Amino acid sequence: MDARRNKRFIVSLEAELILKDVRIASSIENLSEEGAYVITASSKLFSDFAPDTCIELKFQLPSGEKQRLNCRVKWSYKTPPHGLTNSIGMQIIDPPLSYKESLKALI
């Protein structure tokens, strides 16, 4: 049984993670009203993706609407077998109504 509260939308969106003053190119694999699953290239900053780390997620929806969401890392790991990418699950902190409405348009 799936314990998720919100429906996830499978997407493939270019994004940018902003952590302190560092910008990290990434790809969003799925989105929900309150969460995101993101993949980044492996980096020395992996330790900065520890649970509870606050991070900004910046991307553009297919509609053209730009989003900047404040997020909290829930989990992260280096993707096996070689650790060439990082997988990161994030909780969206106080998702704006405009984001929620735009997400519904992806259906």
Predicted regions and their residues:
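Short coil/turn motifs at beta-sheet boundaries
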Residues: 8, 31, 50-52, 64-66, ...
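Short conserved beta-strand and strand-loop elements enriched in small hydrophobics
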Residues: 13-18, 50-66
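Short beta-strand-centered aromatic/proline hotspots
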Residues: 25-28, 69-76
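Short beta-strands and strand-coil junctions in structured, solvent-facing domains, enriched
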Residues: 44-46, 79
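N-terminal helix initiation/capping motif
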Residues: 1-41, 104-107
